[in-house]
Amino acid sequence: MKRLLFLIISLLAAVTAFSQNFPYQNPQLSPDERAKDLLGRLSTEQKISLMNYQSPAIPEFGIRPYNWWNEALHGSARNGLATVFPQAIGMAASWNDVLLQEVFDVASTEQRIKFSTAREGGDAGQYRGLTVWTPNINIFRDPRWGRGQETYGEDPYLMTVMGRAVVNGLQGDTTQQYDKLHACLKHFAIHSGPEYERHIFNVEEV
């Protein structure tokens, strides 16, 4: 009887400890406060494990598995039935940033639905998450580059206007508490086209 009582008390203590509301779980705190609290609780090994695109679960802190690999260049990518919009280079030819923002508002709504459905089914695979590697804002100045169709062309001004519209459409109203999706503009470090000397120059000549 004593052993049974001890077991019950231990289980209750474990459940109470797990259900404890840590500051990082409090939506009333700012994102910075919540992130700082969570990072202070994670070990170095746990932090490293979260740095890959395929982040494992950390059950003791209620962190579910998450896959950061997702795209929405012209609609929800590789994720079953979804609206397929024209490629970016085609939409750039419209010069209509208002329409482009509406397009990506629709795309983000569809992706949110797909995320919720996947999460309910325990699916944390690629192309299921709320982070998208979109838009591609490389300046397309050489037709030999095989990813030019992902961009909004060769004009920096048009790229700026259209890129902003895409981000606003994906993330939603800036007055709301949370973004609909998180947009990741690419490519800053790599995949910048066939110009091999792009990242090498003499700063003394600038």
Where are these regions (language model features)?
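Glycoside hydrolase catalytic-domain context in secreted enzymes
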Residues: Q20-V206
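Bacterial Sec-dependent N-terminal signal peptides
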Residues: M1-N21
